[in-house]
């Protein structure tokens, strides 16, 4: 039993043995083929020579004709000599059996079989090519039919990934070269276990938020190589060295024999404890590596970054994701919006992300909107329908009236809050925007001068809207000293409300103040230390680019083959892997706080509530402690079960993952919230 603690790194009492990777043995399939050949030779020893020789020669031709079908369809010899079909690819079985019947018929006819062995003509070659094309079409139809049958049987499959670029070819070249080498060596079907994990928490923190599971399952659910994929691979220098039968093998490949165990999306996770555990044929699970890392690495890093911003900002502040324009590419922008929302942000400015994932969208206007107004002549439609249905024929005139009332009390305000003259073009811009959005008027007040122009102009428009039954939303600050400006802005609004009275300016001092000036964790800490009056933060660059740490560093390591643990050794102790197929559990204290994550070998006893256990770090012998858990929660769920698809009990909705993230962080001890 081996454990990974949250911060003390205390881990369990039963040791893993260290295994040196053994030489790859010949595959079970190869062994069965040898047994099959011996059985044929044995049975043929009683056959007249004239009968046996044609059988051997015709069998060679038959093997060549069906080999491609065997690899594409997943057909292999059984101990009894009959074909064995694996996974969803149950194709061409009747055709293979027909070849067996032909061979038996040839044996019975004796020497007549020689007439079937001749030099191939061009017509023969064309026929062979036609047969190959038909076989491919038949294989694809059979796979599609099998998948449909799986769905009809109640299995749950997900749609394709939201990014169309996520295909089987979204991988590194060496995944394909390894898959070919496995296939060429006959070891591609060995049962392997891989684990996806990371070695250190990001941002020098003490926790990580797991994200990207839904996209990972979408990829696994639809994993396949298309004919177009294969044609491209054949055209590459790497593919030129590969046999055609291997490409047929790829065309028949899917995740029907793969099982995926995972921690829950949105949960807090820790180093070394697997996020995903994949079990399946060696070549298949190897081919999944790069894509899964791509889907999980950035998602988890971004969700963690968002959660850290939420912790610093506090639970009451509104967090708005504004990072699309600074994101690293289109998918980086959309993914950032999605996983920022999962990590605790409230809304995004990204409209496409809102459409795809149901995230609330928010936004106001830019400086360019204010700059585009050169005066009152830019306000073309002055009419505004009031909240009660009456019509204000000249809303700009009402705004100017309110500005005069503000100027009348200007000298009664605190000295440093008095203004001299506002920018008329800015006032016209605010007025036209309020005409368009009377229910959602939030003004960017720092185009010219926050205290001398922006705030007085905002108040004039807000007071005019109030008279017509509308309530202004607030202001946005996008430059300057945010702590100072937010506090002076709140003081300005309170002065106006006090001097005009609640009848005219009720709740004006309570409008929202939003800040959006290159904000990141350190800025939020500084604002909290110096005090501020900000209600909402718009955060972009530092959130979506994860400027403080650009990558999480997830890895995908082989830990077991055919039931035998495998280990990766290194002079760098941090890169030594923990061998064997493992389960994980989270132990909780009596107060409901998470204490430690425990890893055990599959098949070992599950930790029990109330039973003392020694927990020990996997690499640091001195880090150990006894733990008596009040609650034990399994970490891994079987989320993908081959032909059965995605477990119906797995809730992959974004809202569920978001709520889980919040609850999981709430359960952490204070020393982990760093």
Task: Identify the residue ranges that each predicted region occupies.
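Low-acidity, Ser/Thr- and Arg-rich intrinsically disordered low-complexity segments
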Residues: 2-7, 12-18, 23-51, 118, ...
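Hydrophobic alpha-helical signal/anchor motif
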Residues: 6-9, 16-19, 35, 58, ...
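Compositionally biased, intrinsically disordered low-complexity segments enriched in Pro/Arg/Gln/His
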Residues: 38, 46-48, 55-61, 67, ...
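Ordered alpha/beta subdomains of enzyme catalytic regions
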Residues: 150-439, 452, 464-467, 471, ...
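Glycine-rich beta-to-alpha transition loops that act as phosphate-gripper elements at the mouths
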Residues: 263, 325-327, 513-521, 540-542
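Catalytic beta/alpha-barrel core
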Residues: 444-447, 473-481, 512-516, 527, ...
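Catalytic cores of alpha/beta
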Residues: 519-532
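Glycine-rich phosphate-binding active-site loops on the catalytic face of alpha/beta enzymes
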Residues: 533-551
